Each structure stands twice: as C-alpha cells, then as structure tokens.
Amino acid sequence: MTLSQTAVSRPQIFICTLLSSESLVDLYTQILEGDRYSLVHATYDNFLEIVEQGKHRIDCLIFEKNAALPKVVSHLHREAILLPAVLLQVEESVEKTSQPNSADRDPQQDSYYHIAEVIVDHDQEDILSSIDCAIAQFLQLSKACRLPTRLQKKYADEAIQDNLATQQQRLSQKLKERLGYLGVYYKRNPQQFFHKLTEEEQTDYLVTLKRDYRDIILNYFRQDSSVNQEIDDFVTQIFFADISILKILEIHMELMDAFAKKLKLEGRNEDILLDYRLTLIDIMAHLCEMYRRSIPKTR
C-alpha cells in the first residue's frame, strides 16, 4: 500500500493510520472520505515502511495509544521522522480516566511522540478538529522540538534532537507551501482569539482596532494612499483574532455616528458618510474571501 503520486498534486491532507481494530478502520474511512483527505490505512507489518517512504507527503498520523506504541514511536525517533499526530486513547484503564485529553493537558506534561501530539478518546466524534489541532500545534512548534523526557537521555548521544528539529522545520515548511493559503488557517492560535483575551486585553485590542479602522476610513478615497495595504493588514488582524463581522459593523457604526455629530456641529451634510458603506463592504468582502479560501473543507 503506497501513497498515490497523482493525489499529491491535489490540495488534500494526507492521513496515515495505524489501527488494530477493523471497526476503527471502517469508522475513520467513513469520516475521512471526501476531497479534503487522502487516507492510507497501515498495518503493524507495513506501517514503518509506508511512513519512511511517504514521510515527505504524509501530513498527519493517527495511531492507537496501546502496548505497541512505544516500539513504533522509538523507531520514528531513531529515523528522525516527525509528523503531526493524533493518538487515540483506546485502553479501558485507570490511566484513561486519569489522563486528560491534550486540549486540557499541561504543556509541560510528558508526551509520547512529541509535544505537539493530540490525544483523544477513540470514540470522540470530532476527529476532524483533532487533526486540525494536531497540524496547527505542529506548525507552531519551535525549531527545536523536545522529545518526551524519558527518551531525551537515551537518544542524546545520537544527536536525535538536531535531526528531529531539522525534520520538523522541513515538514512544517512543506505543509505551508503545499497547502498554500489553506496553511494560513492552521497558523491561527485559538488562545489568541479575541474572546479568549482578558477584559483588559480586549479593551486595548479594540482601541487599536478602532484606530486602524478610522485610518482606513480617512484614507479610503484618497489618491495614492496605502489604503489597500491597510485593509489587508486589518483583515489579517481580525482573521487571526477571530473577530466577528458584527463587531466590525459595530465599530463602523460607532465611527460613523462620531463623524455625523462632528459634521452636524460644523453645519455640513452628513450624507457623505453613506459613501463609506463601500469601505465596510470592501473589508467584509476581503474577510469572507480569506475565510472561503482558507477554511478546510469537511467533505
């Protein structure tokens, strides 16, 4: 079983699974079907061969966290193969109930494969977001990826840390280049979303956002202005902060009200402000296009 060369040219996410249960194979085949994913199911006999041959094309691994995992991971470490990974928690044990999923896990807590892995219950329905999270965390790794604590000393003499760092950097760049604009979506950090900020941080953020929007309004109809770049920067900013369109509309209306009051005091007609609806439409169109081109298709 190998990865198709013709499929590589399509903007798909390549998934390689290592599952011992046929029911899990059938389940993930059904979930991951469609034009977004290209899927290959490996066995314990051919997994290492498939990964070694396809390490430049595979975007994410999905394997079970079971008794065979240490041997598999050990081989990947020796070969300096580092890929985004989702680990399925399938063992019915005290360990399962005592260990949180990676979304709630302390970043300093020891890992199995690498510190960007995502651990989920095997029956978790939202495997798609787990894959997205695994890729996102992998892309945000520093150049030096830390091995699990229990393995650092074992592989220190083999300079495996440097090899893994090189592999991570190369694979990260490959993902960004091959996924193109789609890669922008994966660089979003949910912890930096507006609704995750403290009240004080939100206040400061809105002050900056309103100032930037005011500059765009003032420059929008000026000749030889840098307003196009300002709009691009503004849209990128609200995209990565996950700011809602309603919030942008609110900022626009507040600014228009302020301008209207000023014009009224000056005895001038405020109808001119209607032209600035084009500014709002322009920004919303830019933002919608960015989401359209960047959000992965589920099917």
Curated annotation (Swiss-Prot):
Q: What GO terms describe the biological role, i.e. biological process, of this protein?
A: circadian rhythm
Give start and end of each KaiA N-terminal domain: 9-179
Record-annotated KaiA C-terminal domain positions: 189-297
This protein's record includes keyword Manganese = no
Query: Which region ranges are annotated with the description Flexible linker?
Result: 180-188
Q: Which UniProt keywords apply?
A: Biological rhythms
Which residue ranges are recorded for the region named PsR domain, binds oxidized quinones?
A: 9-148
Q: Does the keyword Hydrolase apply?
A: no
Q: Which domain of life is it from?
A: Bacteria
Under PROSITE patterns, the record lists: KAIA_C, KAIA_N
Q: Note what the entry says on domains.
A: The N-terminal pseudoreceiver domain (PsR, approximately equal to KaiA N-terminal) binds oxidized quinones. The KaiA C-terminal domain mediates interaction with KaiC, homodimerization, and is responsible for the clock oscillation function.
Q: How does it assemble?
A: Homodimer. The KaiABC complex composition changes during the circadian cycle to control KaiC phosphorylation. Complexes KaiC(6), KaiA(2-4):KaiC(6), KaiB(6):KaiC(6) and KaiC(6):KaiB(6):KaiA(12) are among the most important forms, many form cooperatively. KaiA and CikA bind to the same region of the KaiB(fs) form and therefore compete.
**What function is annotated for this protein?**
Key component of the KaiABC oscillator complex, which constitutes the main circadian regulator in cyanobacteria. Complex composition changes during the circadian cycle to control KaiC phosphorylation. KaiA stimulates KaiC autophosphorylation, while KaiB sequesters KaiA, leading to KaiC autodephosphorylation. KaiA binding to the KaiC CII domain during the subjective day yields KaiA(2-4):KaiC(6) complexes which stimulate KaiC autophosphorylation.
- Give the protein name, as stated in the record: Circadian clock oscillator protein KaiA
Q: Which organism is it from?
A: Acaryochloris marina (strain MBIC 11017)
Q: Which gene encodes it?
A: kaiA
